[in-house]
From Swiss-Prot:
It comes from the Bacteria. The keyword Cytoplasm applies. The gene is serC. Catalyzes the reversible conversion of 3-phosphohydroxypyruvate to phosphoserine and of 3-hydroxy-2-oxo-4-phosphonooxybutanoate to phosphohydroxythreonine. NCBIfam families: PRK05355.1 (NF003764), serC_1 (TIGR01364). The keyword Cytoplasm applies. Belongs to the class-V pyridoxal-phosphate-dependent aminotransferase family. SerC subfamily. This is Phosphoserine aminotransferase. GO terms for molecular function: O-phospho-L-serine:2-oxoglutarate aminotransferase activity; pyridoxal phosphate binding. InterPro entries: Aminotrans_V_dom, Aminotrans_V_PyrdxlP_BS, Pser_aminoTfrase, PyrdxlP-dep_Trfase, PyrdxlP-dep_Trfase_major, PyrdxlP-dep_Trfase_small. Its EC number is 2.6.1.52.
Length: 362
């Protein structure tokens, strides 16, 4: 079978080495005569998987000891609700930074539980979409926390700054599409959460990294499966966790360490994104509407000067093994998601195809 490069925004491409290893182990994991999908989450064997996955993740992100790592159900959308239920405490408002589709979705969900202070940060620079720098965010004094999304998967907008607010501010970030793409100072955040299906592993698992002093504040009506204190006290096994997704995510963590860690991964991601954005910027046929300083390194949306060619582009791209390039229904056009698992060769193949398509259709 010819090479296929999967540019899906999620569920996304997984490292080929991880998939090959999983294939070898699928039916007879560690000589047990069973798949890892069939063993108890409380067995000695799976507890070793869980412990190693957590340790490898701690190593990759240099997670401080006063942070708990939770492997949860629910997807990021589930945690849009779990977050206010766990962290509002006695307060009735939280700051929600609206920088794109997913940040706004989190704020919309929070309205069920509080009165969010929605801070719009989108602006324009020379006709391009940008976001205001953090120093211009008008944060409130009485908010329980500040929530933002550093990488907007649909919009292709990134906030590359790390928070540097007053020490009293509890900063929460939805890192679903940027987690593990570069080094990160976890200590600047009260909590980070991320759906696994983009840069961690298969769909069905959600990662939560939360500072210990934020536990124990959940409202009494919080479902137990979404109570971070309950999950922490039970080592993420209050109910049966998504064991196969946990196992595969652990393999991805190990793969990232084998590649040289997040410094090396960040270098590769920058090189891939630079190649693709350069191809777009040097063309009159392709258009990216995001200001350079706020472009995502993970999700690159682009349109063609003639939208009537979209279907032709997608069909021909798929014939060349370049799949899942259709843009989100909200934004249209094309979108290339180039997460950690996407090799440079995949982006090069896309750029070569784009140049050839332009020659034939411009």
């Amino acid at each position: 079978m010819s090479q296929v490069y999967n540019f899906s925004a999620g569920p996304a491409m997984l490292p080929a080495e991880v998939l090959r290893r999983a294939e070898l182990e699928l039916c007879n994991w560690h000589g047990l005569g069973r798949s890892v999908m069939e063993i108890s989450h409380r067995s000695k064997e799976f507890l070793e998987v869980a412990h190693q996955a957590e340790q490898d993740l701690r190593d990759l992100l240099n997670v401080p000891e006063n942070y708990k790592i939770l492997f949860c159900h629910g997807g990021a959308r589930g945690h849009f609700a779990a977050l206010p239920l766990n962290l509002l405490g006695e307060k009735t408002t939280a700051d929600y930074i609206d920088g794109g589709y997913w940040a706004k979705s989190a704020a919309d969900e929070a309205e069920k539980y509080c009165s969010p202070n929605i801070i719009k940060i989108k602006t324009e620079i020379d006709g391009k979409i940008a976001v205001k720098p953090m120093k211009e965010w008008q944060l409130s004094d009485n908010a329980a926390y500040v929530h933002y999304c550093p990488n907007e998967t649909i919009d292709g907008i990134a906030i590359h700054e790390e928070p540097d607010f007053d020490d009293k501010k509890i900063v929460i970030a939805d890192y679903s599409s940027a987690i593990l793409s570069q080094p990160l100072d976890v200590s600047r955040f009260g909590m980070i959460y991320a759906g696994a299906q983009k840069n961690i592993g298969p769909a069905g698992l959600t990662l939560v990294i939360i500072r210990e002093d934020l536990l124990g504040k959940a409202r009494k009506e919080t479902p137990s499966v979404f109570d971070y204190t309950v999950l922490a006290e039970n080592d993420s096994m209050f109910n049966t966790p998504p064991t196969f997704a946990w196992y595969l995510s652990g393999m991805v963590f190990k793969w990232l360490k084998e590649q040289g860690g997040l410094q090396e991964i960040a270098k590769r991601n920058y090189e891939k994104a630079t190649l693709l954005y350069s191809a777009i910027d040097n063309s009159d046929f392709y258009i990216n509407r995001i200001a350079t300083e706020n472009r995502s390194l993970m999700n690159v949306p682009f349109q063609m000067s003639s939208p009537a060619l979209d279907a032709v582009f997608l069909k021909e791209a798929e014939e060349q093994g370049l799949v899942a390039l259709k843009g989100h229904r909200v934004s249209g056009g094309m979108r290339a998601s180039i997460y950690n698992a996407m090799p440079f060769a995949g982006v090069q193949a896309l750029v070569d195809f784009m140049a050839d398509f332009e020659r034939r259709h411009a």
